[in-house]
Structures are given as C-alpha cells and as structure tokens.
C-alpha cells in the first residue's frame, strides 16, 4: 500500500510537467540483440522479463530543454526452468523534451518525470524495435503489451542489467 501512495504523490508532484512538456526528438543511441535458437519450436513456450530505467542526462534551464535516457531490456525465457534466455533485446533511447518558458522544474521533479514518463514515451518505439528485431531473427512476431505504470501484464520490471548503458 505504501508503494501505491508514493506513486500517487510522485504523479501529483510532476503533474504540471506531464501537462506541459513536449517531445522534440527521440533517437536510438544504443542497441543489442541476440538469440540462441533457430526456430520457435526450439524455443518452446516462453515468457517475458523486462527491465527498465530512465534518468535525466542534461537540463538546459535557459532554453527549457532536457534530455532523458530511457533504457529497456527484454529477455524471452523458456517457461521450463533451467534454460537460458532464447532472445535478448536491449535499447537505449534519448528523448529530448522542451518546457514552456514560464515553467521551471527542480532536478527532483525532472528525475521523477524521467522515471515515469521517459520509459512511457519510449515504449512505442521500443515495441516496434523488438518486433522488428525478433522478425529479423526469423522467429515469430512478438507484440509487447502497452506500457502500464502498474505491472498488470506478464511483464516483470527489474533493475536494468549493468550492461545497458
């Protein structure tokens, strides 16, 4: 229950930012893909494991521009225990946001915004990237669910792998 209360307070704290920011640019800055199988049959039944993180990388107060680095990694792992991941896809997206001139934000507010909205805003690009990469591996298409602030799908968010930069 305390976690839910904290999320609500965090959302209230950044509500003016959420209502006012604009995305100016989003670009892929790092990516990695790998597979250990040649077919869906070889992979067997799988489940998703997703790790996300996002941080403010730079804030130019004079211009009202800030950049967020959103990192996402998915591992498709067999349902059978003792087997390694069959597919791993990681990506980092840099998102450039602008604030209206009259709105000033503290570093704490920007960091909270980055953690909540950074991944949320990168998610559609991420979904397309994963779908494209898995198809290029000649494996069946994977359609990831929409991103939710609360985890209501099979996706489990964990701390990101230290290899994601």
Model-derived regions, located:
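N-terminal intrinsically disordered, cationic/polar leader segments
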Residues: 1-121, 128, 132-165
